[in-house]
Amino acid sequence: MWNRFSLLPHVVIYIGERLRHTSGNGIEGGALFGELVTAYLFLAGVGAGGVAAASVADLLFVHEPFGADVVPDFAEKRPAERLVAGVLALSCGALALGAGCLAADLGRADRVLSLFLAPPVTLMNLGAWAVALLTAVAAALALARFLYVPWLRRCAMVVAETIACGLAVVVAVYAGLLLQTLSGVRLWSSPWVPALFALSAASCGCALLMAGALFVEGDGSVRKAVRSAARVDVVVIVAEAVAAAGLLAFALGSDHAGVRASATSLMHGPAALPWWAAFVACGLAAALAVEVGCLVRGHGRSRSAAKAGAKAYPTAALALAAALVLVGALGLRAAVVEAGAQRPLELQEAEAPASVPSENEEAAGLRSAPSAEKSGGEGSATEREDVTLWSN
């Protein structure tokens, strides 16, 4: 049943090769905002959403027993219990890979350590701690299901899952807030950015639950979890569409030259393909259509399927919807990063006067964009903004 995960080592090897050929700040081939940044934002959102979705599913529908009532053999556990365990394991892997992208983008071990140890406390520090803690809690929740731990009690798991949900919300919102705090990028100052990232993470969590139905047999708890995930995701996708329209309205209606340039990039520039094709077409329109179709079809089949012990919804269609959601989530982050990160410096409004970098920023390798004085005269007007995720 788990043979479908056999491609995972090849994916890990491929990502490792990409990291090996990428420079220390995540910038490759002259691009001013590297692939590592987008990968980190995507994987952190997927992992956070998956942990939250699996925890909520267990708290509301599965109620997996622990302690003396635990089933020693994982293969003999109920399908819903295996579904939750699989989503938790996959989410933990996504968070770990995202943390690896974060470390690779920083480039040096001392910069990584400074995120956790060096004062002062910043949003970047808090986000790094949240990602690390969520990864640890997700790993503990997954291992408790795969391993035989007879002394573990259900009440302890409920507390851990509640904590995991709180940390997942922090991680989901953190990425958008981090972009919002970067000076000189007006597009990211919109409150629609963290809202979009948080909604996208929630949609990804629902997608992982729906995709996980491919790997387990259908029972009452699985049907409830999958049906609820599909219904919630329909609402989340509609909210995403509203937030996306709000971000576009903010960009198109702004009088600021930098925001207008970002709007041009989203409409028909470098960010247009991931925004319109991946996010809007796949992640919003197509995913919504497939999920609504599954819900309508499943409503008529639910009673007969429950009597027969079959799955209430076509799992292949749900897996397709999940894949579309994940493609849209990646496209959203790629488009927002591309539209906001590479605007000319002269178009961006200085949010604060230049200051000497703090010890924490200096240790983490934070550097401000090159000044016009260094870039040289009038030629600096056409230079692109040198921004990485760790710029301030």
Give residue spans per PLM region.
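A cytosolic-side transmembrane-helix exit/cap motif
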Residues: 209-212, 337-345, 366-368
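Hydrophobic alpha-helical membrane-insertion segments
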Residues: 1-3, 295
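Low-complexity, proline/glycine-enriched hydrophobic segments characteristic of transmembrane helices
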Residues: 2, 346-392
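Long, contiguous internal "core" modules enriched in hydrophobic/ aromatic residues
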Residues: 41-43, 62-72, 79, 132, ...
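Leucine-biased recognition of intrinsically disordered, low-complexity hydrophobic segments
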Residues: 7-8
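Membrane helical hairpin/interfacial module
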Residues: 46, 50-130, 134
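Basic polycationic patches enriched in arginine
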Residues: 4, 18-20, 303
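Membrane-interface interhelical loops and short amphipathic "cap" helices
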Residues: 11-37, 68-76, 103-125, 176-196, ...
